[in-house]
Curated annotation (Swiss-Prot):
UniProt-annotated binding residues for Mg(2+) 2: D114, D117, E281
Family: Belongs to the FBPase class 1 family.
HAMAP family named among the record's database cross-references: FBPase_class1
Subunit structure: Homotetramer.
Protein name listed in UniProt: Fructose-1,6-bisphosphatase class 1
Location (main, coarse): cytoplasm
């Protein structure tokens, strides 16, 4: 018998603390949780039911899709379009926004999601996950357009991710701290196991793809060189490097023990401002990290203050332990 609250109970208790709450937000979160449970089940059984491997298609980003990318996207859409809580959706896998079919009622929220982050790892049994961001639909809008989604990250109502690893974990923030829930497979419920998650201000761990070092801008080169010099250098401590190529895994590690994650601009394609998507990855993860006491930046700007220009806009991402990210920001200011 669990003494900690189920996620459903936790959400309802939060709702009761807000006198004006109607239950729509609670209902939406519960629907997202249900979709993530379904994806978790398929990820766990992928090799047994022949849903691993390439789908033979590309997404809007021009990236080859895995079978589970397509299946996970369909699960999110099919689980949420009929509920009456959403005005529209947007997916990293789809070019335009996803309207709510006419036969279903429309709600007051907009949902953006990456249905299976890190899916390049799925065939080699490394953790993947689902990332989502909830925005309010403008009050006077009955048929949302893409422009209605172009809100800065500071306007997010809620952000979360579900990581499908040795255990399935759901991490959530609604702007009042960060909480983590573990899926009990026996009863099919998420249990609060990591209340009030906080990122340590200091760290001795960085995550970056070192194979791209020659393409980085000078401030990032300088920061990483400082770390690599260890105790003998200006940092006076030894650092460890991590790189999983799965943002949900990287951010979850930072939430539990600190660290800095960097996916900076590089000169391989200098006209691209970055690699990660602002609306589906950078904004929700930045909201979570900041609510846990961390910092998130492009190096030059707070990510949550970026005014989006498109739903598939890309940005550089530097996030994690406060003192490390602020050091990288300072190096950019000095450059």
């Amino acid at each position: 018998m669990h003494s900690n609250p189920f996620l459903t109970q936790f959400i309802l208790e939060e709702q009761r603390s807000i006198p004006s709450a109607t239950g729509d937000f609670t209902g939406l979160l519960n629907d997202i949780v249900t979709a993530c449970k379904t994806i978790s089940h398929l990820v766990n059984r992928g090799g047994l039911i022949d849903i691993l491997g390439a789908a033979g298609t590309e997404n809007i980003q021009g990236e080859g899709q895995k079978k589970l990318d397509v299946i996970s996207n369909d699960i999110m859409v099919n689980s949420l379009e009929w509920t009456g809580h959403l005005g529209a959706m947007a997916s990293e896998e789809i070019e335009g926004i996803i309207p709510i079919p006419g036969q279903y009622p429309k709600g007051k929220y907009l949902l953006l999601f990456d249905p299976l982050d890190g899916s390049s790892n799925i065939d080699i049994n490394i953790s993947v996950g689902t990332i989502f961001s909830i925005l309010r639909c403008p009050d006077d809008v009955s048929e949302p357009t893409q422009e209605d989604f172009l809100q800065p990250g500071t306007q997010q109502v809620c952000a979360g991710f579900c990581v499908y690893g040795p255990t399935t974990m759901m991490v959530l923030t609604a702007g009042h701290g960060v909480n983590g829930f573990t899926l009990d497979q026996d009863i099919g419920e998420f249990i609060l196991t990591h209340p009030n998650m906080t990122i340590p201000e200091d760290t001795m761990e960085f995550a970056i793809n070192m194979s791209n070092q020659r393409f980085w801008a000078a401030p990032v080169q300088r920061y990483i060189e400082d770390c690599l010099q260890g105790k003998e250098g200006c940092r006076n401590k030894n650092f460890n490097m991590r790189w999983v190529a799965s943002m949900v895994s990287e951010v979850y590690r930072i939430l539990t023990r600190g660290g800095i994650f960097m996916y900076p601009w590089d000169s391989r394609d200098p006209d691209k401002p970055g690699r990660l998507r602002l609306m589906y990855e950078a904004n929700p993860m930045s909201f979570i990290v900041e609510q846990a006491g961390g910092v998130s930046s492009t190096g030059d700007q707070r990510i949550l203050e970026i005014n989006p220009e498109g739903i598939h806009q890309r940005v550089p991402v530097i996030l994690g332990s406060k003192n490390e990210v602020e050091r990288v920001i300072a190096y950019h200011q000095e450059a």
